Curated annotation (Swiss-Prot):
Family note: Belongs to the metallo-dependent hydrolases superfamily. Adenine deaminase family.
E.C. number: 3.5.4.2
GO biological process: adenine catabolic process
Gene: ade2
Name of the protein: Adenine deaminase 2
Catalytic activities: adenine + H2O + H(+) = hypoxanthine + NH4(+)
Keyword Hydrolase among record annotations: yes
Length: 573
């Protein structure tokens, strides 16, 4: 037998026996063709021989639940970053680009992925818009779903975010999509988003065809999901001692995998990707073989990627040579049998500019804002209003509602004389001109202002501030840049993060973007914003499926009841 490549003297992880076995590995036309002891493969001739020097060899890592746009980079940049972190296959859901450009945005992401080294499979965004209580640039319905199914890169239906409609509105758009997908594409998985659901509600979700959950987990919640036949996708925020101990102590190998979901650009550059979660699981005491399985074979099975996830005959030759035994530290990463990353060699990125259609760089259709745009008009000249207030807490993206007294003078809410800050959002697609104002408190900025078009999921212009002048300055900096994030204090832009592709992505190399993201976070933190992930906290203030009180261009949203509620609760003189 003659093959392209023969990897000699390695200890191969066998996903089926959970063992490392001293072997040689033959590869031809990008796939494994034989794995065995050197004397078993001695008749094989190869164009290239790689000396594995006794290193451990594991499959390329697979992440089946993530959003490229969370890193604010293009697929090309994302692929570059993934390879040095051992990830060779992903299933990405581009619901941010879908919210901005609809089906055109999804197709553009798929096209931008075509030349990437990493295999980028896609989930069809199922919740665009996430609710009917916001204005987005695009929408995905059954017709768009069917059109996308003609694309070979589609692997599943993306996370069903509006679980409230699934449970309580049989004729809702969400349920129509679910029923159509199950009937038309029964072999494909459906991803879920069901935080804290248990009991009958959870069983209704599973019965509707939703087969996984990637939200924050607890021991009790995991047990309930596994018993109901639901697959667990464990992201880093769920990797508590309690959760990991449950996974370690119980026979859960076939019921979970690790996923990243959202990774900020600075974290992607400095910390890594799925390998970060893998090493965290190891540190908690999970067996090395089980961690490998949770990052390779388990996700491949969940997504029915039967051609990968193991080093076995016929599988795609994606593999990693480990620099340290029993650790996710890589000396080399191979994709389709070809070297993609070598830790001993320079690894530089040369990104391509203007990878998207011209109008993707002109998506913010807002005129410059004025001070009057941030005036909150009351229905009386003077007095006191009881107002709903969004309360932000470090450690969570949930925002609690409180009701507080705020003075009114000359027909305007005097929020600047209170303990609260102003939050405002402006529809930026040129569709409705909608806008809304609210009050916000808690672990947020205490002075200055911040503005962003990176605001889940509608990506309208979101502004939070302690004074109107800085809010105007921050908003206009973002508008002028055609999208991004700006921090302003005393009329001076302290940090600017340009995101010109749809107002949510940058084409800069990761090495350039990551420090800008870090500077933005530092500037925001310097104004008093307290959160373990300030960008995620800020950007989800407009996410109307994340409890409990959020804001969109429709107004304040009571998430638990799925309805718009007024800022003013009642009046007192």
């Amino acid at each position: 037998m003659h093959v392209d490549t023969l990897v000699k003297n390695v200890r191969v992880y066998n996903a089926y026996t959970q063992q490392f076995i001293a072997s040689d590995v033959a590869i031809d036309e990008g796939r494994f063709v034989a794995i065995g002891h050197s004397d078993e493969l001695e008749s094989i001739q190869a164009n290239t021989i790689i000396d594995g020097q006794g290193q451990q060899m594991i499959p390329g890592l697979i992440d089946i639940h993530l959003h490229i746009e969370s890193s604010m980079v293009t697929p090309e940049t994302f692929s570059w970053a993934l390879l040095r972190n051992g990830v060779t296959t992903i299933v990405a859901e581009p619901h941010e680009m879908a919210n901005v450009f609809g089906i055109e945005g999804i197709k553009a992401m798929i096209e931008a992925s075509a030349a990437c080294t990493v295999d980028m499979k896609y989930a069809i965004p199922s919740s665009v818009p996430a609710t009917s209580l916001e204005t987005t640039g695009g929408a995905i319905g059954i017709a768009e779903m069917d059109e996308l199914m003609d694309t070979e890169d589609i692997q599943c239906l993306g996370e069903i975010m509006n679980y409230v409609d699934v449970l309580s509105k049989p004729d809702s758009k969400t349920n129509q999509i679910l029923k159509h997908f199950r009937r038309s594409y029964p072999a494909l998985p459906i991803e879920g988003h069901v935080p804290k659901l248990t009991g009958l509600d959870l069983h209704q979700i599973v019965a509707a065809g939703i087969g996984s959950d990637h939200t924050h987990q607890t021991r009790e919640g995991m047990e309930a999901r596994i018993k109901a036949g639901m697959f667990l996708e464990i992201q880093e925020k769920s990797m508590t001692d309690d959760v990991l101990s449950y996974l370690i102590e119980n026979d859960t190998r076939e019921h979970f995998c690790f996923v990243t979901d959202d990774v900020m650009a600075d974290s992607l550059y400095k910390r890594g990707h799925l390998n970060v979660l893998a090493n965290k699981a190891l540190a908690a005491g999970m067996k090395f073989e089980d961690v490998i399985y949770a990052c390779t074979m388990a996700p491949a099975k969940r997504m029915k990627l039967e051609d990968r996830g193991a080093i076995a005959p016929g599988k795609i030759a994606d593999f990693i040579l480990l620099a340290e035994d029993g650790q996710f530290v890589f000396s080399a990463v191979y994709k389709d049998g070809m070297l993609a990353f070598d830790a001993a060699s320079p690894y530089k990125q040369t990104p391509k500019p203007r990878q998207f259609p011209p109008h993707f760089y002109e998506s913010v259709k807002l005129a410059p804002l004025q001070e009057e745009d941030f005036h909150v008009v009351a229905d009386r000249q003077d007095g006191i209003h009881v107002c709903r207030v969004m309360n932000v807490a470090d450690g969570s993206t949930f925002t609690k509602e409180t009701q507080e007294r705020v003075p009114v003078a000359n027909g305007l809410l005097q929020w600047q004389d209170s303990d609260f800050r102003l939050i405002a959002t402006f529809e930026r697609y040129g569709k409705t001109g909608g806008r809304a104002h609210g009050l916000i408190a808690g672990d947020i900025l205490q002075r200055g202002a911040v503005a962003t078009t990176y605001s889940h999921d509608n990506h309208n212009l979101l502004v939070v501030g302690a004074n109107i002048l800085d809010m105007v300055c921050a908003a206009n900096a973002v508008i002028q840049a055609q999208g991004g994030c700006a921090v302003v204090e005393n009329g001076e832009v302290k940090a600017m993060l340009e995101l010109p592709v749809g107002g949510i992505l940058s084409e800069a190399p990761l090495a350039e973007l990551a420090p800008k993201v870090e500077s933005f976070v530092k500037a925001l933190t310097a104004l008093g914003y307290k959160h373990y992930n300030p960008i995620m906290s800020l950007s989800t203030l407009s996410l109307p499926v994340s409890p409990a009180l959020k804001i969109t261009d429709f107004g304040l949203i009571d998430v638990n009841n799925g309805q718009v509620v007024p800022l003013f609760v009642n009046e007192k003189s």
